[in-house]
């Protein structure tokens, strides 16, 4: 009798194990199905994302979208340089770039980051502009962050289209490249996506992911990145920041871009009566952007802003430099 009871117990145990295995298999299948429902396959096929790097680019303009778009499973996100090797951002941080524009013939998404003087100078680089046009001819999306819109605009593709850029650079984008500038965090005009300054590139990156993979996938990425910005103050753009602060920053940008936007070569043979800019102290051998005649003498200045500062009280600078 005991042998019979033991045999029955063994049979029941085996049956129980088989039942649990079946339940587990069913559970796993159900879990996979739920994941498939929650994160459906991509609506748009994106296999390659190239982030352009050049000396003087703004760090977060490139690294923000690089990190965000790097969350696209099955997508190769990489840097593309004007040349291979080390590329320095605007603050001198160097990044090794293993792929040059000469080697890349197609990208599903191109990201063009912004910067400052170097970015504007690249709007005249025909080699780069022709490469962007070639990539754009077959890309799914062609995008820019911050003043990278200047470079994209220089190809002609933003002429007559809605776009945005860094708040200070909007006038250049409109006047030089014909864009219909919008006061938005990011703007989509067909296949072209442009973002406002620096941090806005991450928002644009999330919007691109939403377009490619949908809401649930985007929310999962936001959770993975713990993307929940909470700045200490409201502000960050020219329309929601104190006017005095905006004007001070605008003046700084104006001075910094003076030589690039208004290059003057006719001053090279002029003998100046000052060796340094009276207002800021910068040596004139680095370049002269403006001049003034005062008390029979000719003074040079590194920017119009410095000249204007001098002219408010020129007598106070007597004997300086």
Could you say what each language-model-derived stretch is?
Residues 13, 17-142, 150-154, 170-171, ...:
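Extended, subdomain-level signal for the structured scaffold at the beginning of enzyme domains
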Residues 4-12:
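Sec-dependent N-terminal signal peptides
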Residues 277-280:
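Short cysteine-rich clusters marking metal-coordination/redox-active sites
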Residues 304-321:
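Short metal-binding segments enriched for Cys and/or His
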Residues 183-196, 226-227, 233:
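Conserved Rossmann-fold dehydrogenase catalytic segment
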Residues 285:
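Short functional micro-motifs and their immediate structural scaffolds
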